[in-house]
Amino acid sequence: TDYFLEELGVEKFALLGTDYVYPRTTNNILESYLKDKGIEADDIFVNYTPFGQSDWATIVADVVALGEDGKQVGVISTINGDANIGFYKELAAAGISADDIPVVAFSVGEEELSGLDTSNLVGHLAAWNYFQSAESEANADFIAAWKAFAGEERVTNDPMEAHFIGFNMWVNAATEAGTTDVDAVRAAMYGQEYPNLTGGTAVMLPNHHLAKPVLIGEIQADGQFDIISQTSEVPGDAWTDFLPASAVLKSDWKELGCGMYNVETETCVQLTSNY
């Protein structure tokens, strides 16, 4: 979002998502964040579509219409699955390039692009904590090992790096604890560090989230990403400050033993998960 605002000069936002909890929660946070940054409510367009949505003509027309006053429009997409193919195809059919209306996707990565005709997607963006194109010796070794195991045509992606880091942290924590007992390993996990494949170091925080860099990649014709922006490690926050209901909440399992601690009432709202 900051990249859109600061680097691309986006003034109007289309928040497009598949109709389920992740896009709705993400867009609620984004709406609040954008308004906090001075974006007017009338300059934020939100739309949800079912899984597998194939008819994008009306929605793309609505997005294009946002820019009729000359303001720069950008799309933040939490569209999932095959619906992405139709969305980008409709953008191209309408003559809209990434230079005209940039799209940054939170759900499109190397695996989703593998084997697809990416001609309609070239130049658009995606945001992850990892891209296969990251240049580091550790990443080169990781990619080589994966291709040797799964086949030369297979790609790596962000969830794979997250699993790689998490598993290695667990091994180190279990080794330190001298046991695989859950409580002992969990106590040893806090503060664990492991190298990111993009460079830098991932750190396990007391809220069970990692500190990791945020990367923005530009889609290339071969389905890979050209990394155009990378932050330093950003601490993962279990509860966003941009929604009133969660702004008062804190997650700290190490000192407070609570994942949903209300800092105003100084009480643990919930000790156990709903799931």
Which residues fall in each region the model found?
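Extracellular/periplasmic Venus flytrap/periplasmic-binding protein
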Residues: 1-94, 133-141
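Cofactor-binding loop segments of dinucleotide-utilizing enzymes, especially the Rossmann-like FAD-
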Residues: 18, 106-108, 129, 221
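Extracellular/periplasmic ligand-binding modules, especially the Venus flytrap/periplasmic-binding
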Residues: 21, 80-86, 131-193, 211
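Pocket-lining segment of extracytoplasmic ligand-binding domains
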Residues: 47, 72, 110-115, 135, ...
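Venus flytrap/periplasmic-binding-protein-like
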Residues: 96-119, 162, 186-195
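Rossmann-fold dehydrogenase core element
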Residues: 118-129
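Solvent-exposed, acidic/polar segments of extracytosolic/periplasmic ligand-binding ectodomains
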Residues: 191-275
